[in-house]
UniProtKB/Swiss-Prot annotation:
The keyword Metal-binding applies. One of its GO terms (biological process) is protein maturation. Signal peptide: none annotated. Fe cation binds at residues 41, 69, 72. This is Hydrogenase maturation factor HypD. One of its GO terms (molecular function) is carbon monoxide binding. Pathway: Protein modification; [NiFe] hydrogenase maturation. Its cofactor is [4Fe-4S] cluster. It comes from the Bacteria.
């Protein structure tokens, strides 16, 4: 299988593990004083556990799981606002499937659907656009959610709706950006991070230079990585080489997919449709300056926040996390999922307490799927 099996070669993986061990010993990394490397992307977290890299790698390397899952960092208040919109009789509310079971303060979208709201799972914002064409008497709202990876497709749907004059199509925009929460983590005096594995899919869109501040301002290395086991091992090795050489740079291990300057067509669509919010709330991190996107005035007719007066366009109420939920601590690397008192007890994939157990990219779901269920017994 071209571009997959080549990156799962056991002999190559063994060689990388040996070189990682040599460098880890050289810089004095031990289980008691490990090198902390944060993998930002939830997809990387799942790959690490799927291939058992956390068990195979030198004990002086510790993976810290970052806030790179857009469903997981969505605060409960935004889920409540989705349900408020979806509960209107004129609305068809469209969402990706992984957002359906994320708990709000009282209900999830799945539970709201069971209670009678017209909520539909779609695979693309273009599916929602087609629903708007077929239902001119209904308001079709797409739940725009995700990092820079999914932001362009939502932008293209908004542009198309504007061209067609589809006034009954709007987007509840929850698109967020990756670099800003990394800065927030680095500014946290309680966080000890020695390097980063940068997100592959996000970087396909934005390129590698938006991360330059990590090396220039904080002196930390970041390596953009692919998702196969040897991709991740090579990225760890590249981070360790920088540390051993006393330097910090942004490097691109995933050069077969990620262009240095990103995807210019996607970036142009993002720039046309969106502008930065002054701040946006992240689960576990609070409000982070300039970390969220909102729809520009030129496309305001397709902005569900403005149309329905919810969210940042209306009166927002603070919503606390569910009692006992430690998602915030897990997403900011302060706690491993199995250290949470609710893991496998009050919080399971069947009955999730927090978003990290729901999403396909959540750290708690990864721990559960790849052996954490046994640890909880």
């Amino acid at each position: 299988m071209k571009f997959a099996s080549e990156f799962r070669d056991p002999a190559l993986a063994k060689g990388l593990l040996a070189e990682i061990a040599r460098l880890a010993d050289q810089i004095g990394a031990t289980a008691e004083k490990p090198v902390h490397i944060m993998e930002i992307c939830g997809g990387h977290t799942h790959s690490i556990f799927r291939y058992g890299l956390d068990k195979l790698i030198h004990p002086g390397i510790e993976f810290i799981h970052g806030p790179g899952c857009p469903v997981c960092v969505l605060p409960r208040a935004r889920v409540d606002e989705c349900i408020e919109i979806a509960g209107r009789p004129e609305v068809i509310f469209c969402t990706f499937g992984d957002a359906m079971r994320v708990p709000g303060s009282k209900l999830s979208l799945m539970q709201a659907k069971a209670a009678g709201a017209d909520i539909r799972m779609v695979y693309s914002p273009l599916d929602a656009l087609e629903l708007a064409r077929r239902n001119p008497g209904r308001e079709v709202v797409f739940f725009g959610l995700g990092f820079e990876t999914t932001t362009p497709s939502t932008a293209l749907a908004i542009q198309q709706a504007a061209r067609e004059g589809l006034a009954n199509f709007s987007v509840f925009c929850n698109h967020i950006t990756v670099p800003e929460p990394i800065r927030a983590l680095l500014d946290d005096p309680y966080m000890r991070l020695d390097g980063f594995i940068g997100p592959g899919h996000v970087s396909m869109v934005i390129g590698i230079h938006p991360y330059d501040f990590i090396a220039e301002d904080y002196g930390k290395p970041l390596v953009v990585a692919g998702f196969e086991p040897t991709d991740l091992l090579q990225s760890v090795l590249m981070v360790l080489r920088q540390i051993s050489q006393g330097r910090a740079a942004i490097e691109n291990q995933y050069a077969r997919v990620v262009p240095e300057h990103g995807n210019r067509v996607s970036l142009a669509a993002i720039a046309d449709v969106y502008e930065r919010r002054p701040s946006f709330e992240w689960r576990g991190l609070g409000e982070i300056d300039a970390s969220g996107l909102r729809i520009r005035a030129a496309y305001r007719a397709h902005d569900a926040e403005e149309k329905f007066g919810v969210g940042y366009a209306g009166q927002r109420a603070a919503v606390e996390e569910a009692e006992g939920c430690a998602c915030g601590a897990v997403m900011t690397g302060r706690m491993k999922p199995v250290a949470c008192a609710q893991f496998g007890k009050g919080c399971t994939p069947e009955m999730p307490l927090g978003a990290l157990m729901v999403s396909s990219e959540g750290a708690c779901a990864a721990y559960w799927q790849y052996g954490g269920a046994r640890a909880a017994e």
